[in-house]
């Protein structure tokens, strides 16, 4: 079984870098084609309801809301030390939209209903009505107490030395936090953990953000320091409740466990339905794992400044084309994973797709070649599949720093007299800045449909929200629910990989799927001058020796780099232009079963080099990459003189540890 997490692969060989000349593409005039979403196209092909769950409107809406919430948390840059409204205030309009209904009523809990409905559809399991009703009733109370908390916070912000307002705010906080704490068991009802998981993840997110509030502002509200310390961390087995640190651990491990359990169930129940398996993986990644990966940054004592995070995972849209036979609509999941999913590698940027065409007969695509580069580097590799063709046409993608992404793909598909044979006949790749590029080899026909694929839109760009202002625009946030996103100014994912499957009996590539990465993955590893910058280790550009990329555990927002004995990884980062001298502490988030010496080398823009060996302590004794298996270590300090942007090369080397160690992120902390 090739699941989304916990498998290891060797890094692909990158010796071949054969590039091919570009063939000019033209927008050939054709018939006016009907444009459909995937489910509509499948219904047209089969005259029955399709199992393509991602286009169920409930799933779409829940995924869009989750996408917007994650984007909001990624984009927030509140000053940590300032007395400001909570990060929660930015998310309230998504959790409880103003148009949903009167506050505290069942109708106002539409977002939580959508999360449950979506996970029900994806897991093929319905929540018992009594359990659903209990959860909704809990949300009614939480909303009511939350509104008291926001009001008390607004009152205090206007008069921060008023002891009565401080007292009321402390009481409102305690009531709100108690309601969340007492409700969490109702959001993980036994037997329904998976269909309630996307709702649970957002409930946990709310609880953690609320505890972050009290750690940040509790002294100003009049709490004693010992009380704040307990809200931050409490390991006493008998007294009090777990603090923020303990809850990040337990909530993370819970969400990852039930995500993996659900994915295993999809694998077992849908062996010849990769779409169902992939739907669960993609949508639950967006609704659950993406926000989970940001929870470590809620620790204000470890992240005392706003933090710039990135998601590097890849998600895939539905299979298009003909992969099965008369008995099964699709090939088995294992085969589809091998053909359609990119092998774990350093994070890549697609630069060229070359199609090898044979424009005769039924099947036209004989082969395809893709060229990739790594982040902030000309290093890369080429991946080939299939056979030679008579004609070659290319799609050229500009360099990553240009920011001209492919944000949507329209695929020309038509049905055939062969059962289950829906034939892909061409593509239109939509770019965010330049003109569309097309691949087509025959004129359109009346039986064709254009299938649009991409991911949800991000929510409105609001970096702060003042709920205290009755005229604040964020009180009326309305996400763009179009799917795929119809506005290239707020797209959430960029196209990154063209998976293609070869049917040996036809010597042609007959089925395809598209990989997409999140737009938070930056093109040049730019370090922020004022915020903590997280650079995932997979954003490196070179692996040497026994280094390889392994699948992440689900809680890290992407894959990890494992350094075996005598191996290293190099990462290129860009420092910002500055009028003053900038300094950064470099910190690793890593996993190791033994103490070991890590070699650290930094090559500066003037080619001077700083090297040192650092003793890193073991972080775990086991093999499972649970939350507590990861730990942090400050490995050094760099400064930059007053200068324009510069490139630094950071190389991490394992000289001696035979069992190897795993790197999640490299963090640059301004000092």
What is each PLM-predicted segment?
Residues 5, 29-38, 59-62, 80, ...:
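Short amphipathic alpha-helical segments that mediate assembly, nucleic-acid/protein binding
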Residues 101-109, 156-164, 238, 577-580, ...:
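Intrinsically disordered, low-complexity coil segments
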Residues 47-123:
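Membrane-inserting effector segments that mediate pore formation, membrane fusion
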Residues 107, 111-156:
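Charged, amphipathic alpha-helical linkers/stalks
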Residues 2-52:
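Membrane-active, amphipathic/fusogenic segments and juxtamembrane/transmembrane anchors
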Residues 87-91, 95, 353, 409, ...:
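Short low-polarity hydrophobic stretches
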Residues 3-6, 10-13, 156-519:
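Membrane-inserting hydrophobic helices used for pore formation or membrane fusion
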Residues 396, 400, 404-671:
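Extracytoplasmic
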